[in-house]
């Protein structure tokens, strides 16, 4: 079924063969709740608990393709969620750092990604993804899987020269757009908006008191 999903995504316009092959080899059913396994290969988002979703496969593939991975990159993912996107990145990049703010999702992803799948090139952290992972920065690629009103400054600061960030931008209840931010070697940034999207909002930890 994963191979059929990859073929469908190819018909829908995904062209990166490495992305399609990774989707064909990774069983999305492992990342959805048991009662939704029968719907795992449908091209639509599914609830995974805690008010969060696993994104529509086309959007996952589109965002992954937009990163332009060739296999050696250091990637920061903001929002581990189900771990599906993380596992795809692990197959396509050199090393992945992923941050999840929801404790229950973070624990579930850790058990699946590091335990069941044994992904040695994945590092996981429970925390505020909008703050990035400063001690591991800079990153060649940054992928944000929740929408923010603007690019979080800490993430912008952690993007390496020559790097690329892909993220949804917009308010939770208004129009959002998938944006690509590229930083040239000289530090000059180029921004391109790709397509309208709908993501859960990027949440933050409450301030310390």
From Swiss-Prot:
Keywords: Cytoplasm, Methyltransferase, S-adenosyl-L-methionine, Transferase
Biological processes, Gene Ontology terms: methylation; protein modification process; protein repair
One MF term in the entry's GO annotations: protein-L-isoaspartate (D-aspartate) O-methyltransferase activity
Reactions catalysed: [protein]-L-isoaspartate + S-adenosyl-L-methionine = [protein]-L-isoaspartate alpha-methyl ester + S-adenosyl-L-homocysteine
PROSITE patterns per record: PCMT
Keyword Methyltransferase: yes
InterPro entries membership: PCMT, SAM-dependent_MTases_sf
Residue ranges of the TM segments: none
Catalytic site positions: 55
Location(s) in or outside the cell: Cytoplasm
Biological role stated in the UniProt entry: Catalyzes the methyl esterification of L-isoaspartyl residues in peptides and proteins that result from spontaneous decomposition of normal L-aspartyl and L-asparaginyl residues. It plays a role in the repair and/or degradation of damaged proteins.
Similarity remark: Belongs to the methyltransferase superfamily. L-isoaspartyl/D-aspartyl protein methyltransferase family.
Protein name: Protein-L-isoaspartate O-methyltransferase
Species, as recorded: Anaeromyxobacter dehalogenans (strain 2CP-C)
